[in-house]
């Protein structure tokens, strides 16, 4: 999911019985005409027409969302109202909604902290440090899609899960098969079929 789609998720967008997420809007923090030139939150339609979709939850996502729901039953649900919508799942430390800026800053704090410690350890051990490169929410979306492409052969299913308007986007940008995956694909073909 795009970070704006994740930030815009509301409890009513989840179907815990079917383990599905309804992606039908995005929460965007930007400058808008009529808002006096300041940045504000607005609910918008997804980035593309294909962006409106139903996606299945992975087991880890299901468990994390159930745990968050239980936590919010004790601590209170988000009551922020934006463009008539409320009940947003992901909150900042003050109980308001999140946007990509603070999320990307939190990610940066994690890898910067690790890299700082790794630089010291590597210097003490007189070895080359193993550093985590810069990454953001979008990089995680890209990585998710790449891993999905490595494990799934139905490109149409991948397009629908990712919400790409054009299947060419799925093929061009995300289908980055590694040499190892290409070798595994040929081995699987040979094992599963008598092709000669």
Language-model segments: residues:
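Short, charged phosphate-coordinating catalytic segments
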Residues: 1-33
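Gram-positive cell-envelope targeting signals
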Residues: 3-11, 97-100, 139, 144, ...
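Phosphate-coordinating loops and pocket residues in cytosolic domains that bind phosphorylated ligands
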Residues: 8, 16, 172, 176, ...
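Residue-level signal for well-ordered alpha-helical positions
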Residues: 9, 68-71
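C-terminal secondary-structure termini that scaffold catalytic or DNA-interacting sites
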Residues: 18, 25-52, 59-61, 93, ...
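Catalytic-site neighborhood detector that most strongly recognizes the C-terminal catalytic loop/helix
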Residues: 27, 143, 162-187
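Short, basic (Lys/Arg/His-rich) helix/loop patches that form interaction surfaces
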Residues: 55, 71-80, 85-97, 101-160, ...
């Amino acid at each position: 999911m795009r970070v704006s789609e994740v930030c815009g998720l509301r409890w009513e967008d989840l179907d815990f019985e079917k383990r599905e997420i309804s992606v039908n809007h995005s929460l965007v923090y930007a400058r808008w005409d009529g808002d006096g030139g300041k940045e504000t939150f607005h609910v918008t339609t997804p980035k593309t027409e294909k962006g409106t979709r139903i996606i299945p939850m992975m087991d880890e996502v299901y468990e994390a969302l159930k745990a968050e729901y239980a936590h919010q039953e004790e601590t209170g649900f988000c009551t922020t109202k934006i463009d008539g919508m409320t009940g947003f799942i992901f909150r900042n430390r003050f109980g308001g909604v999140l946007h990509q800026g603070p999320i990307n800053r939190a990610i940066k704090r994690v890898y910067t902290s690790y890299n700082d410690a790794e630089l010291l350890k590597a210097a003490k051990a007189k070895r080359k440090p193993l550093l985590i490169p810069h990454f953001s929410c979008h990089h995680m979306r890209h990585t998710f899609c790449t891993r999905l492409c490595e494990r799934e052969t139905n490109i149409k299913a991948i397009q629908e899960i990712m919400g790409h308007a054009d299947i060419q986007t799925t093929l061009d940008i995300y289908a980055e098969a590694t040499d190892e995956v290409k070798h595994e694909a040929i081995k699987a073909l040979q094992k599963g079929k008598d092709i000669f």
